[in-house]
Amino acid sequence: MEKVPMTTAGFESLKKELRWRQQEERPRIIEAISEARAHGDLSENAEYHAAKEAQSYNEGRINELEDYIARAEVINVSRLSGDKIKFGATIKLLDEDTEEKKVYQIVGDQEADVKTGKISISSPIARALIGKQEGDVIEVNAPGGAHNYEIIKVQYI
């Protein structure tokens, strides 16, 4: 079974979602199915079919979360240090083309959310950053074209 790197915060977030899906969402869906059944003919009962679809999605997500949690290699980022960029690093970059500054943290695939500055360890920009250090310049080939970034700061927070 292949281990999946994950920050402590990401691991706790997955456990929280799993608890919610098992303890709150599952009973709510079961109740919705029961109520829809009470309306009679199931072949044309849209509420019943919607509830069954929600149940299928929820159970699939529960299985997925259980798998991620079982395979998690939890890494406490605050205990990491060093000059070189690795999993868990928070990096401040300067886009040399636009002069725009960006801050990213390299996290596991399941935690990635570009809107909040969390990029997947398997993303093109993270792969370009791994092993680099402050002052280095990287080139990232993105869908919108190549970008050059200068690494301004590396932290483990």
Swiss-Prot record:
It holds the Pfam family GreA_GreB. InterPro entries: GreA/GreB_C_sf (IPR036953), TF_GreA/GreB_CS (IPR018151), Tscrpt_elong_fac_GreA (IPR006359), Tscrpt_elong_fac_GreA/B (IPR028624), Tscrpt_elong_fac_GreA/B_C (IPR001437), Tscrpt_elong_fac_GreA/B_fam (IPR023459), Tscrpt_elong_fac_GreA/B_N (IPR022691), Tscrpt_elong_fac_GreA/B_N_sf (IPR036805). One of its GO terms (biological process) is regulation of DNA-templated transcription elongation. The keyword Glycoprotein does not apply. Keywords: DNA-binding, Transcription, Transcription regulation. The keyword Transcription regulation applies. Belongs to the GreA/GreB family. Necessary for efficient RNA polymerase transcription elongation past template-encoded arresting sites. The arresting sites in DNA have the property of trapping a certain fraction of elongating RNA polymerases that pass through, resulting in locked ternary complexes. Cleavage of the nascent transcript by cleavage factors such as GreA or GreB allows the resumption of elongation from the new 3'terminus. GreA releases sequences of 2 to 3 nucleotides. This is Transcription elongation factor GreA. It comes from Bartonella quintana (strain Toulouse). The lineage of its organism: Bacteria, Pseudomonadati, Pseudomonadota, Alphaproteobacteria, Hyphomicrobiales.
